[in-house]
């Protein structure tokens, strides 16, 4: 029986993108069933001081998450993964920042109505977005970011954690071994943190 895995992501986050591609690789070598959930860096950083160089990014961060949550609400959970991939390939692999065009193209690629793009600059789905965000961040605390992953523990209780953060994403059995180790560490009672400073920028492949 496949292990259900929930991942909360923000399409704008390069580290979440890498982790999500790793999970897809894990799915090739381990029996897991991924459920894609939305969280928001814009919500996470509300009320926090934002360095000027990140202000525009935070303002634009609302658009993709609103579009993804609206697409899920109107068309079901099955559209989330392909829409995320279509957005992420443009944002991260191609390095584009023309978000309105990115959203229009991504919606067209996955066969969703172009009108969904309109919610990117409105607040009409924000309650749904905030609820999804809180479900994820409520599992790990608000002093972390995206991605958040949750899996069932031995007794069915959720085991949740931020990350793992890596670059580049491992492939094949290396991806599976990292998954095995992550579950072992995260499932250890009383374990909270294992960290070292990053010395590389996100590497996409």
How would you describe each model-predicted region?
Residues 1-6:
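Extreme N-terminal starter segment of soluble prokaryotic enzymes
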Residues 10-13, 54, 58, 119, ...:
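Charge-dense, low-complexity intrinsically disordered segments
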Residues 13-16, 149:
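The canonical Cys-X-X-Cys-His
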Residues 16-19, 130-132:
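Short amphipathic alpha-helical surface micro-motifs
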Residues 24, 98-205:
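C-terminal cap of thioredoxin/glutaredoxin-like
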């Amino acid at each position: 029986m496949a292990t259900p895995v929930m991942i909360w992501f923000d399409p704008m986050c390069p580290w979440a993108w890498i982790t999500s591609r790793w999970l897809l690789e894990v799915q090739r070598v381990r029996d897991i069933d991924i459920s894609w959930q939305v969280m928001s860096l814009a919500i996470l950083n509300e009320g926090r001081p934002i360095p000027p160089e990140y202000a525009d990014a935070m303002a634009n961060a609302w658009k993709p998450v609103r579009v993804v949550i609206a697409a899920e609400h109107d068309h079901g959970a099955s559209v989330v993964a392909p829409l995320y991939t279509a957005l992420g390939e443009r944002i991260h692999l191609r390095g584009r920042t023309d978000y309105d065009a990115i959203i229009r193209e991504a919606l067209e690629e996955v066969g969703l109505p172009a009108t969904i793009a309109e919610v990117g600059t409105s607040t009409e789905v924000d309650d749904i977005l905030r609820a999804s965000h809180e479900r994820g961040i409520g599992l790990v605390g608000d002093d972390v970011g995206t991605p958040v992953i949750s899996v069932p523990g031995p007794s069915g209780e959720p085991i949740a954690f931020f990350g793992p953060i890596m670059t580049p994403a491992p492939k094949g059995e290396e991806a599976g071994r990292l998954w095995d180790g992550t579950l072992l560490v995260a499932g250890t009672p009383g374990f909270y943190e294992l960290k070292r400073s990053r010395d590389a920028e996100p590497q996409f492949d």
